[in-house]
Swiss-Prot record:
InterPro entries (UniProt xref): AFP_Neu5c_C, AFP_Neu5c_C_sf, Antifreeze_III, SAF
Alphabetical list of PROSITE patterns matching this protein: AFP_LIKE
Gene3D superfamilies: Antifreeze-like/N-acetylneuraminic acid synthase C-terminal domain
Descriptive protein name: Ice-structuring protein AB2
Tissue: Detected in blood serum (at protein level).
Keyword NADP assigned: no
Localization per record: Secreted
All copies of domain AFP-like, residue ranges: 3-62
Record's keyword terms, sorted: Antifreeze protein, Secreted
Top-level taxon of origin: Eukaryota
């Protein structure tokens, strides 16, 4: 299963857009790639670096 990975540096409190995210096979696994449409508009609660895997605790109100 692919996970959501940052396609660029995403500053803290930024609302996610499609261009900021990509799907990749990573370990450890993060948020599943099929969640990308749901993540659009949600804010990150810390800076996320290029190629960093998005984990559930990095996205505000993600459950």
């Amino acid at each position: 299963t692919k996970s959501v990975v940052a396609n660029q540096l995403i500053p803290i409190n930024t609302a996610l857009t499609l261009v900021m995210m990509k799907a990749e096979e990573v370990s450890p696994k993060g948020i599943p790639a099929e969640e990308i449409p749901r993540l659009v508009g949600m804010q990150v609660n810390r800076a996320v670096y290029l190629d960093e895997t998005l984990m559930p605790d990095m996205v505000k109100n993600y459950e």
